[in-house]
Amino acid sequence: MPNNATLVVAGDFRTDEAKRYISEYFGSIPKGADIARNYPKEDPITESKEVNWGDPNIQLPAYLFSYRVPGQSERDSYVLSMISNYLSGGKSSVLYKKLVDDEKKALQVQAVNLGLENYGVFAFFAIPMGSTSKDVLQKDIDAEVKKLQTTLISDEDFQKLQNVAENNFVNSNSSVEGIASSLATYHVLYGNANLINKEIDIYRSITKEEIRDVAKKYLNPNQRVIINYVPEKK
């Protein structure tokens, strides 16, 4: 339906000609009914919850520690994206180096900020190595989060995060297709297509103190849901 769609034209074109083609190809499509967007409001998570999910098709367990965080248009969501990069963005990141490379406690570990329109999810995902227990992985992940909450990251690590943010932004907008995709995303999910000109400045303005404070605000044990995804006998 036209009233639930976004059309982006990017590249070298004449505006009057583009409008004529848009009208020619899409103008006859009728408008649909009005769309009600009444999203439920969720109560804050104030105590830890744990659930088990068995799957007969897997051989190794996986553990998910997830937290509800702000929607992707909020400034704190940008900070959480930098936190996820610091903790697990690449083989030199804190959690990968500690749990996978050095201590061989995990086959895989990730920290992901999944930005969504209203609320987001920040989640740690870990697959244990050998007999490593969930409690051990949870303790080690919590310890790294605690460091973030109480100690400012180094200038070197902070500069790396800034470099990653700039590199990701440039790469995603280095082609006409990428620019069109970004414009659509910013308009539909953020309500502001002009973020294509301003989002990088948001990342550049984030401070080490904000990283500490946002970790302290959202990544606490009483604010999470733990999912144990475990093998189940057939």
Please describe what each predicted stretch is:
Residues M1-N3, S28-E74, N85-V136, D157, ...:
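Non-catalytic beta-strand/loop surface segments
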Residues M1-Y25, Q223:
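Non-catalytic, conformational "gating/processing" segments within enzyme and secreted inhibitor domains
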Residues Y25-A33, E103, D142-I153:
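A common structural junction motif
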Residues S77-Y78:
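Zinc-dependent metallopeptidase catalytic helix centered on the HExxH motif
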Residues I141, Q162-F169:
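Short amphipathic alpha-helical coiled-coil/interface segments
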Residues N192-N197:
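Acidic/histidine-rich, surface-exposed loop or edge segments in extracytoplasmic proteins
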Residues K217, P221-R224, Y229-K234:
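Gram-negative outer-membrane assembly/targeting C-terminal domains
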